[in-house]
Amino acid sequence: MKSRKLLISLALFILIVPVLTACGPTKIDVALSTYKIEMSATSAKAGDIVFHVHNDATDLTHEFVIFRTDLPADQLPLNDEGAVDEEGPGVTHVDEVEVEAGQAADLAVNLPAGNYVMICNINDNNEQHYMHGMYQAFTVK
């Protein structure tokens, strides 16, 4: 009788654990380096997503900025200084985090299905990080 209860308990545990772990947020690792954004995934399911952002640069602060947009990643609207116009046509600013060199931060967001672009919008001594290729397209399904 004890072994039957144990088997039933074990079977319930095996069935419940995947359901509970599927309920948590999607986690995506992001590495920022000199003029580069690398992500462990470029798509995710709609819902809660936590981006674990690490700045691998040794001397530059970077931003991780999320825009919802249908524009190509390399064609976002620019302001007079050459940075992305965060209120420009065709882009909706979602959220952002600034990460000092060698540091890490988490950015938790709830994203509906759609197209997104992640960028660094830092202007460092008239060097626009976005213009140097610091962007990554991202799709939420």
Regions found by a protein language model. Name each.
Residues 70-80:
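Short aromatic-acidic-glycine turn motif
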Residues 25-49:
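N-terminal edge beta-strand
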Residues 19-22:
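C-terminal motif of bacterial Sec signal peptides marking the signal peptidase cleavage site
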Residues 53-56:
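Asparagine-centered strand-capping/turn motif at beta-strand->loop junctions
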Residues 63-67:
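Beta-strand signatures of extracellular beta-sandwich domains
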Residues 83-93:
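Short beta-strand and strand-turn-strand segments in soluble, beta-rich domains
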Residues 1-10:
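Bacterial N-terminal signal peptides that target proteins for export
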Residues 58-59, 97-141:
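Extracellular/periplasmic metallocenter environments
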